[in-house]
Amino acid sequence: SDLVSEGKGLDLSQIAGIGISSLCPGLAAFGEDGEVLVDPILYSDRRSTEEAEIILSAVGSDKLFEITANTAMAGATSGTSMLWIKRNLPEIYEKTKYFGHVNTLMALRMTGRYASDYSNASYSNFFETAGGFKWSSHICDKVGIDMEKLPPLLHSTDVVGGLINQELIGMGLK
């Protein structure tokens, strides 16, 4: 807003889209009305060390890597944090409509729609990078994470939706 309010010679009518880039992973749990239920859990948070071991044991480290091209690491992959929430904050897990990263939060605030791009999804432990760019029912079933709580997937270049954020619209963006 500072850049827009200071002028800086911007012609807002020339802005055709807004790209989103964010720290990854930074896991957020969203309620039914889009409210953030817990502070985002960042990549450096190590509280889910035990959950990383549970994922590796349930799926198998070789199988997990075969499906996701990743391993389970506390904080560094958000699946461990999702499982931590399920095990330690069950009331939050039950209230969660979708899990997503910080970019999901930004998209939701701007468009009213939940989404994750493939690159962010690849940090979740639940995304098939080798099997069709989709959420893995195999891994979710083994770990006990409800697939319905994972957001719709998009390419990084896809349009999430139209701008509905009144603050941004009030600044002249469309």
Describe these PLM feature segments:
Residues 39, 51, 55, 109:
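Residues that scaffold the ATP/ADP-binding catalytic core of kinase and kinase-like folds
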Residues 41-42, 120:
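Residue-level structural signal for beta-strand termini and adjacent loop
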Residues 32-36, 54, 58-59, 64:
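Hydrophobic or amphipathic alpha-helical targeting/insertion segments
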Residues 2, 50-54, 84, 105:
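Generic beta-strand or strand-like secondary-structure segments
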Residues 45:
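Carbohydrate-associated surface elements
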